[in-house]
């Protein structure tokens, strides 16, 4: 991930169990005992995320929610229908861990998943066509506040559909990511939808459209598992503070 290259209230959200003890005027402090038990490792020992237990901590509307223990965070963000939930499930080897929404654009919460050494944070999808002006403004504030102020954020995985050129919303997100100064890794999803010979062509076209070097972009498929181990390895390295 390359920095900048893409280019407290007491409210609570959905958790594995109800969150109690929130204090008005202060951020939530969420401990590991508030979620369901850790889900045990998946079947692929070559994937560094499959050999670690993972726990859903909760869904929260406040970008300053405080978690205990405090660990580095890697955020996943992308357009609605980019395949973010499916990719997350395959990355960690836990089918059904992240719910694939039947109502894209409706989720406005930050979903936190804890691994032993860091959190994965599933940010709401952007660019849903039927979202009103107020919803878009609220989304922008939520994500902008998280990107700019979250002290534990170690990096962002930015998902784009390999079949399409960057949209206006994608370019706006690229600007927000660049302004945040956070390390960003661009990841192309749904590679199984193209022929093998078309993949390098699209990698070149999209890298050029985004102003990125091709080695700053990874190709993945939740269906064929293309690039999954490589992406998991990059995420673990970024959470450890390595430049990937």
Predicted regions: what they are:
Residues 2-16, 21, 25, 31, ...:
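Small-residue-biased low-complexity repeat regions
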Residues 3, 29-130, 240:
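Conserved G1/Walker A P-loop phosphate-binding module
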Residues 51-63, 193-244:
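Canonical P-loop GTPase G-domain recognition
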Residues 61, 106, 118, 125-127, ...:
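Conserved nucleotide-binding/hydrolysis micro-motifs of P-loop NTPases
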Residues 70, 96, 109, 135-139, ...:
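Helical mechanochemical/support elements of P-loop NTPase systems and associated helical scaffolds
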Residues 144-215:
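Conserved C-terminal guanine-recognition region of P-loop GTPase G domains, centered on the G4
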């Amino acid at each position: 991930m390359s920095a900048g290259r893409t280019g407290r209230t007491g409210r609570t959200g959905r958790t594995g169990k109800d969150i109690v003890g929130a204090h008005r005027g202060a951020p939530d402090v969420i401990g590991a005992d508030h979620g369901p038990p850790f889900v045990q490792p998946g079947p692929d020992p070559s994937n560094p995320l499959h050999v670690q237990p993972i726990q859903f901590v909760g869904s929260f509307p406040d970008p300053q929610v405080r978690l205990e223990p405090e660990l580095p965070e890697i955020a996943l963000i992308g357009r609605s229908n980019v395949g973010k939930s499916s990719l997350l499930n395959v990355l960690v080897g836990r089918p059904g861990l992240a719910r694939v929404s039947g109502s894209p654009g409706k989720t406005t919460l930050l979903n936190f998943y804890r691994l032993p050494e860091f959190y994965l944070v599933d940010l709401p999808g952007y660019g849903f066509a039927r979202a009103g002006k107020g919803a878009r403004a609220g989304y922008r504030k939520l994500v902008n506040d998280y990107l700019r102020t979250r002290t534990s954020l170690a990096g962002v995985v930015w998902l784009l559909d390999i079949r399409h050129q960057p949209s206006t919303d994608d370019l706006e997100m690229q600007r927000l990511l660049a302004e945040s100064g956070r390390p960003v890794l661009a990841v192309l999803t749904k590679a199984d939808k193209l022929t093998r010979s078309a993949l390098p062509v699209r990698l070149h076209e999209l890298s050029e459209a985004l102003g990125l070097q091709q080695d700053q972009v990874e190709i993945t498929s939740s269906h064929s598992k293309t690039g999954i181990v490589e992406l998991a390895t990059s995420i673990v390295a970024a959470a450890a503070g390595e430049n990937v």
